[in-house]
C-alpha cells in the first residue's frame, strides 16, 4: 500500500526524493495508457487472493466495486492524477484507497510491480496485435481485390530501376500483398508468445501465498503460464519481437510506397493519387505531392529506431528486473500508434489510386522482349546461353541501325541465327509475352488468378 508520501515503496526511506529525480523516475505520462488493463489485472488478482484465503468474499467484492469505479473515472475522463502518482499502478491503488479505505492495501499482497507491469503490458499488446492484424488484413484484401479487378493491365516491370520485362499490373500489386501476408502471419506468432501470463511471479522468487496462477490465467484469458518467475518479470523479448515485426512490415510498406512515389511522377505517370491522400505546395500551385506515401516511407525509420533502441537497452542488463525496462512502454505505444496510422493510410491510398492504363501500355517497348527472343530460340532447340548471346546480338544490331528491336527484318535476324523464321512475329506481342509465364507464381493470367486464390485462402486461414 502507498506510504504517507504516496509511494508504494516509501517505508524504507526518510528523506524526500529530489524533485528532478521525481520527474525523471515517473512514467505516468505514458503508462497511463495501461489504465484499463491494470484494472483488469487487479480484478483477477483480487479473485486469486480470495481463493487463497487472503481476502474475504466481502473484501474482494469491495475491491472489485472500487476498481469498477476507478475504471469508470478513467473512461469518463474524470480520473484526477496527483503529483505522487509516479506510474499507473500507484495512481490506481491510491484512488482505490480513497474510494474504499484500508481494504485497498490488501490488493497488492504477494504482488510486485514487476509482475504487475509486465502483465499489464502483455494484456495491452495482445489487444493491440489483434487490432493491427485486422488493419493489415484489410489492406491485403484491398490489394487483392484491386489485383483481381485490373488483371488485364500490362506495364513495365523493373529491375535496377531499368525497364526489364512486361508484367501484369496485378502481378506488381500481388508481389507486395504476398509479402504482407508473411507479416500478418508473423504478427499472429508474436501475439501467441505475448499471450502468456506472468502474474503471480512476484518480484523475482514467485508467490509464497498459495495464489492459483491457473485461476489468474483463466480470468485474464491467457493461453499459457510463464515457466520461471525470474524470466517472467525481466524478459522483454516479446516487446523486441513486436518491434521487429513492425520494422519488417514497415520495410515492405516503405518499398511499396517508394514504387508508387515513382509511378506517380510525371516522368512515369502510371498512377495518380487521390486528392484525399495528397497535399499541395505553399508556393507552387501546380504541385500535387504524395505526402501520404512519403510519410509511410519516412515513418519506417522511426520504427527501426525504436526497435534498435530497445535492443540496445536490453543487451547489457543483468538478470531480473531493472528500471531500464521502463523504456519498453514508450517504444510499444509509439510504434503501435504509427503502425495503426500507416496501415489505414496505405489502405486508403490503394483503394483510391487511379491508374493510367494508356501510359502504362505506351511505356512498354520492344527491347523489353529481348528475353522473349532468346526463349523463342530455346524453343527451336538452341541452348539458352547461345540463345541469350544471339538475342544480345539482335539488340546490338537494332541499336546500331537506330531502329526498334521488332523492326529488324527476318533476313537480318537470320544473319544471327538460321533458326529465326516467320513465326518470330509472335514474339513482339506483349500479351503473348506475359502469357508464356504460366508456371505457378508467374505473371500469366492463370498464375495471377492462382495467386489471388492463394492469398485469399491464407487470409481466411489466418483469421480462423
From Swiss-Prot:
UniProt effect for mutating residue 178 to M: In ARGINSA; reduction of argininosuccinate lyase activity; no effect on protein expression
Post-translational modification N6-acetyllysine, affected residues: 7, 69, 288
GO molecular function: argininosuccinate lyase activity; identical protein binding
Annotated site residues (Increases basicity of active site His) in this chain: 294
Annotated consequence of substituting residue 385 to L: In ARGINSA; severe
Entry comment on modification after translation: Acetylation modifies enzyme activity in response to alterations of extracellular nutrient availability. Acetylation increased with trichostin A (TSA) or with nicotinamide (NAM). Glucose increases acetylation by about a factor of 3 with decreasing enzyme activity. Acetylation on Lys-288 is decreased on the addition of extra amino acids resulting in activation of enzyme activity.
Protein known as: Argininosuccinate lyase
Organism: Homo sapiens
Gene behind the chain: ASL
